[in-house]
């Protein structure tokens, strides 16, 4: 299955020093999945193969609080570091993978929620509000639908 055929990921994500990383290897992917305890969805891997993290270009994506997408890296700002921060320090529920930074600086997050997956095994996307007792709202059936 091809992902993101209707989205120009290179326009959506801007490279930067905080959230963009060099292309990842299969070993990097395996280490990330082992560290966070979740297998990354194929759509997220496909996105990160095009651009391994970065800030959101609001000219392309202007109706969301998402400000960056985490890349595969063990460095600061990478998925391993940020997963640990949100799950262990901020005590978000471990229902899946927090995949990007929000404009609220952590008071709410978007997660790939594995409690519900579509027919292709892709997790739904939820918004979790840390300030409202981690209330969960479904926002999209999968990552591609979320970014369209």
Give the residues covered by each predicted segment.
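A surface-exposed partner-binding patch
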Residues: 1-106
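A broad, low-specificity signal marking well-ordered, structured residues that form hydrophobic/aromatic
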Residues: 96-97, 109-110, 123-126
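Broad, structure-driven detector of short, well-ordered beta-strand segments within folded domains
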Residues: 107-117
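Short, surface-exposed beta-strand/loop "edge" segments at domain boundaries and coil↔beta transitions
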Residues: 105-109, 132-139
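Short, flexible loop/turn elements at secondary-structure junctions
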Residues: 101-103, 116, 129-132
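Compact, glycine/acidic-enriched structural inserts
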Residues: 124-127, 136-147
């Amino acid at each position: 299955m091809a992902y993101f055929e209707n989205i120009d990921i290179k326009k959506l994500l801007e490279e930067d020093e905080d959230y963009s990383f060099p292309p990842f290897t299969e070993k990097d992917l395996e280490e990330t999945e082992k560290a966070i305890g979740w297998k990354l969805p194929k759509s997220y891997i496909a996105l990160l193969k095009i651009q391994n993290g970065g800030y959101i270009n609001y000219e392309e994506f202007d109706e969301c609080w998402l400000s960056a997408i985490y890349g595969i890296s063990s460095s600061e700002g990478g998925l391993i570091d940020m997963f640990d921060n949100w799950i262990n320090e901020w005590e978000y529920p471990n229902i899946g993978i927090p995949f990007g930074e929000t404009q609220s600086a952590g008071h709410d997050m978007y997660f790939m929620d594995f409690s519900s997956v579509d027919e292709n095994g892709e997790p739904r996307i939820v918004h979790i509000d840390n300030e409202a007792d981690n209330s969960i709202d479904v926002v999209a059936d999968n990552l591609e639908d979320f970014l369209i």
